[in-house]
Regions:
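Structured C-terminal cap/extension of enzyme domains
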Residues: 204-306
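Alpha-helical structural signal in soluble globular domains
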Residues: 40, 64, 68-73, 97, ...
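Catalytic alpha/beta core domains of metabolic enzymes, predominantly
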Residues: 129-133, 144-249
Length: 306
């Protein structure tokens, strides 16, 4: 049975494959990819996160991806599903769909479409309503870059978590190690998991009490936890450099997955299938070249690690 609180480690936010001719979901490639990721040393999968282009998917497609993931990874592998939307009602619909499709946790962005109207009381009321009605444990997703600049501070997150036992964690894509420190010092890890949202501050977060990261590079976590700090730091520095070109937009993120993890999963024509969904463009040749360079360096370091 999957624990109520997400377990420490690396949770991978999976990208979404599309049929390049029809711009519809390629569920066969998706299933193969999910199965590969589940075998690669991860703690769990995140379906329908930012990298999955969740806001470009229909409600039916979102449910299809979660169900495909559950089929691919079996009944016991942990799945966290993104359920971000603009209203409380929409979020609750997505949560119920996720529960039916087999998710174990839901990852919830704050409402943000009307930025100036999204006041602290609105945010607190939103998470109160969602957590009370959700059949699944809730993980707060703090990502100012996709939320009109709305940034939940550690006091607000603590207040929400203490009031709502069904809020069991947070993903911080705000790059604040200080926020990780304060939350880890305030909320017991048995009741609340604090995850970083980018690989480039993974070790910084671990050193002050984070549970891990919702990003790539599971081997950095394992090396650090095994006490191989120098090796972990060497790979971590390269991973941090890789974050910049690979995270400059969804197009480069998906291209990096196409030439690295999708290739390892044995998925044919991955570059075509991992183009961003329309109307967004694929990466430029210059961007591709930079991604290839940094990913080759990371792969070389990985190959030399014992």
């Amino acid at each position: 049975m999957v624990p109520r609180v997400p377990q420490p480690g690396i949770w991978c936010p999976a990208v979404t494959f599309f049929d390049p001719k029809t711009d519809t979901l390629d569920l066969a490639s998706q299933e193969r990819y999910y199965a590969y990721l589940a075998r690669s040393g991860l703690t769990g999968l995140v379906i329908l996160g930012t990298n999955a282009e969740a806001f470009l998917l229909t409600r039916e497609e979102r449910a299809q991806l979660i169900a495909t993931a559950r089929k691919a990874v079996g009944p016991d592998f942990p799945i966290m599903a993104g359920v971000g939307a603009h209203s409380t009602r929409q979020v609750l619909e997505h949560i119920n769909d996720a529960s039916t499709a087999g998710a174990n946790y839901v990852l919830v962005l704050p409402p943000a479409y009307f930025g100036k109207a999204t006041t602290p009381p609105v945010i607190k009321s939103f998470f109160d309503d969602v957590s009370c009605q959700s059949p699944l444990p809730v993980v707060i997703y703090n990502f100012p870059g996709v939320c009109n600049g709305i940034d939940l501070d550690s006091d607000m997150i603590t207040t929400i978590a203490r009031k709502n036992p069904n809020v069991v964690g947070v993903k911080l894509t705000c790059a604040s190690v200080g926020k990780i420190t304060r939350l880890a010092a305030t909320l017991p890890p048995a009741e609340f998991s604090v995850f970083g949202g980018q690989s480039d501050f993974l070790i910084g977060g671990l050193s002050v009490g984070s549970a891990g990261c919702i990003a790539a590079f599971a081997n950095i976590y394992e090396l650090y936890k095994a006490g191989k700090v120098d090796q972990a730091m060497e790979l971590h520095r390269k991973a941090a450099l890789a974050e910049s070109p690979c995270k400059s937009g969804i197009a480069t993120t998906k291209y990096a997955a196409a030439i690295f993890s999708a290739k390892a999963a044995g998925i044919e024509d991955a570059e075509e299938k991992l183009r961003p969904r329309k109307p967004y463009d694929p990466p430029s040749e210059a961007a591709k070249q930079e991604v290839r360079k940094v990913m080759a360096e990371v792969a070389a370091i990985e190959a030399g690690l014992s």
